[in-house]
Curated annotation (Swiss-Prot):
The gene is C9orf78. Plays a role in pre-mRNA splicing by promoting usage of the upstream 3'-splice site at alternative NAGNAG splice sites; these are sites featuring alternative acceptor motifs separated by only a few nucleotides. May also modulate exon inclusion events. Plays a role in spliceosomal remodeling by displacing WBP4 from SNRNP200 and may act to inhibit SNRNP200 helicase activity. Binds U5 snRNA. Required for proper chromosome segregation. Not required for splicing of shelterin components. One of its GO terms (cellular component) is chromosome, centromeric region. It is found in: Nucleus; Chromosome, Centromere. Residues 5-58 are annotated as: Interaction with SNRNP200. Belongs to the TLS1 family. Its main location: nucleus. Keywords: Centromere, Chromosome, Chromosome partition, mRNA processing, mRNA splicing, Nucleus, Phosphoprotein, RNA-binding, Spliceosome. It comes from Homo sapiens (Human). One of its GO terms (molecular function) is U5 snRNA binding. Residues 232-283 have a biased composition (Basic and acidic residues). This is Splicing factor C9orf78.
Length: 289
């Protein structure tokens, strides 16, 4: 009988372990790269120590702005520098960054700028560098006292600035996503509150209805109230005084009454009834009053 050899699989532990190590190294390198990119994108909190050590850079343009025509020091005036001194400012204003535009639109307050300003003013005070404008105090005349306002009339703008700062600080706080569970809870609580409010309103209506007071109280009020309204466009009628009797005198005689025509008397053709005429005249007289 031929001898049958059993075939056994050889272990490939070394090759698989090497592949796993390579994959783990690639993943680790990718993670490190992403972390470095995230760190570069992060905005540094507060004022950096390097910026404080370097201090404020004094540009050459400041000297030109202070004395462009060299009236104090003397010398030749460079007309090229005078013409080109405003170009850099325009280019800087045009290059608006995303952070500055976003903070301006959302009314966000830059705390670092305020901190730097405070540090600069405190350093100037300690070094004794005080601005000349603060030291200059104009002597007051007798007429200047007339233009001064008392303290009770002065409008203080401190309240407005405090409100503005509080709004800016609130807008600078980042929003935190609470998740779907919190939103669902809020929706459920609002629906429960609506149902409770509707139930309370229905109960109030049921309690208010009684057998003595009708439900259509407003309709009854309007129906009965119409009799108390005065007529606005009613014609104003004058009270006609009755004619006073004339006093009798000696020698007065009663006037003879006109002769009454018999009822069956024939009227002439030109004689017409005057009822319509007098009726129209009476209507016109009533319209006047």
């Amino acid at each position: 009988m031929p001898v049958v050899r059993k075939i056994f699989r050889r272990r490939r532990g070394d090759s698989e372990s090497e592949e796993d190590e390579q994959d783990s190294e690639e993943v680790r390198l990718k993670l490190e790269e992403t972390r470095e990119v995230q760190n570069l994108r992060k905005r540094p909190n507060g004022v950096s120590a390097v910026a404080l050590l370097v201090g404020e850079k004094v540009q050459e343009e400041t000297t030109l702005v202070d004395d462009p025509f060299q009236m104090k020091t003397g010398g030749m005036v460079d007309m090229k520098k005078l013409k080109e001194r405003g170009k850099d400012k325009i280019s800087e204003e045009e290059d608006l960054h995303l952070g500055t535009s976003f903070s301006a639109e959302t009314n966000r307050r830059d705390e670092d700028a305020d901190m730097m300003k405070y540090i600069e003013t405190e350093l100037k005070k300690r070094k004794g560098i005080v601005e000349h404008e603060e030291q200059k105090v104009k002597p007051k005349n007798a007429e200047d006292c007339l233009y001064e306002l008392p303290e009770n009339i002065r409008v203080s703008s401190a309240k407005k600035t405090e409100e503005m700062l509080s709004n800016q600080m609130l807008s600078g706080i980042p929003e935190v996503d609470l998740g779907i569970d919190a939103k669902i809870k809020n929706i459920i609580s609002t629906e429960d509150a609506k149902a409770r409010l509707l139930a309370e309103q229905q109960n109030k209506k049921k309690d208010s209805e009684t057998s003595f007071v009708p439900t259509n109280m407003a309709v009854n009020y309007v129906q009965h109230n119409r009799f108390y309204h005065e007529e606005l466009n009613a014609p104003i009628r004058r009270n006609k005084e009755e004619p006073k009797a004339r006093p009798l005198r000696v020698g007065d005689t009663e006037k003879p009454e006109p002769e009454r025509s018999p009822p069956n008397r024939k009227r002439p053709a030109n004689e017409k009834a005057t009822d319509d005429y007098h009726y129209e005249k009476f209507k016109k007289m009533n319209r006047r009053y």
